[in-house]
From Swiss-Prot:
A GO molecular-function descriptor: thiazole synthase activity
Main location as per UniProt: cytoplasm
Annotated protein name in UniProt: Thiazole synthase
Subcellular location: Cytoplasm
Family indicated by similarity: Belongs to the ThiG family.
InterPro entries hit by this protein: Aldolase_TIM, Thiazole_synthase_ThiG, ThiG
Pathway: Cofactor biosynthesis; thiamine diphosphate biosynthesis
The reaction(s) this protein catalyses: [ThiS sulfur-carrier protein]-C-terminal-Gly-aminoethanethioate + 2-iminoacetate + 1-deoxy-D-xylulose 5-phosphate = [ThiS sulfur-carrier protein]-C-terminal Gly-Gly + 2-[(2R,5Z)-2-carboxy-4-methylthiazol-5(2H)-ylidene]ethyl phosphate + 2 H2O + H(+)
Keywords per UniProt: Cytoplasm, Schiff base, Thiamine biosynthesis, Transferase
Length: 256
């Protein structure tokens, strides 16, 4: 069970809504993933009507919607988008994204922290997408963010946990949930994130662009479950030396 702010989730896999070939395929993949929290970019939906091609099937699926501010380049733009989302969707939950460079889509740490502090004061439940910076993540936690979402690698790159060393520090010091977001390309990456202590992962591109998104979503669901179970089971510690799993000489001594 994962708790963030006032909500609890059975699934530790969060999913996105971009890059799917159709809305129907998107919903089928989300259902197959078991995800209960789904992000959607405000710039991709028509907030004036609930029969929007993306919004309507998500509402029907009964998932918790996490609107994001993707496309915002400044704190002011993100705050404006957040208020539009709250008014249109009736939720104060928000994935805060501010990335001024469209080529790399890396989060702006200064603008993100500034927007996060303001939005928390305005009553939003803020989950900020941020760099894998332990100092920044701690500052975001201190201003009241409900979770932190450090990147594993650039958005959509499928490179995996390239920031692993920093993620480990973030996880170790965090007192709010840590959701590894961006760069997760295959199910084994998700399993590794849960094994190392992350509370959840957010996956979009790896599922949406797969040859079979529904089966890939199932694979991610199983990987997240396996990673979490492995961590909870207490894996053995690493060693530089070999340790025999059975006696090496007992049968020789017995027959001497």
């Amino acid at each position: 069970m994962l708790r963030i702010a006032d909500k609890t989730f059975d699934s530790h896999l969060f999913t996105g809504t971009g890059k799917f070939a159709s809305s129907q395929l998107m919903v089928e993949a989300i259902r197959a993933s078991g995800s209960q929290l789904v992000t959607l970019a405000m710039k991709r939906v028509d907030l004036r009507q609930h029969n929007d091609a993306i919004l309507e099937p998500l509402i029907a699926a009964g998932v918790t919607l996490l609107p994001n501010t993707s496309g915002a380049k400044t704190a002011e733009e993100a705050i404006f988008a957040a208020h539009l989302a709250r008014e249109a969707l009736g939720t104060n939950w928000l994935k805060l994204e501010i990335h001024p460079d469209a080529r790399w889509l890396l989060p702006d740490p200064i603008e993100t922290l500034k927007a996060a502090e303001t939005l928390v004061q305005q009553g939003f439940v803020v989950l900020p997408y941020c760099g894998a910076d332990p100092v920044l993540c701690k500052r975001l936690e201190e201003v009241g963010c409900a979770a932190v979402m450090p990147l594993g690698a650039p958005i959509g790159s499928n490179q995996g946990l390239e920031t692993r060393a920093m993620l480990e520090i973030i996880i170790q010091q965090a007192t709010v949930p840590v959701v590894v977001d961006a760069g997760i390309g295959v199910p084994s990456h998700a399993a590794q994130a849960l094994e190392m202590g992350a509370d959840a992962v957010l996956v979009n591109t790896a599922i949406a662009v797969a040859d079979d998104p529904v089966n890939m979503a199932k694979a991610f669901r199983l990987a997240v479950e396996a990673g979490l179970l492995a961590r909870q089971s207490g894996p053995g510690s690493r060693s530089h030396f070999a340790h025999a799993t059975s006696p090496l000489t007992g049968f020789l001594e017995a027959s001497a």
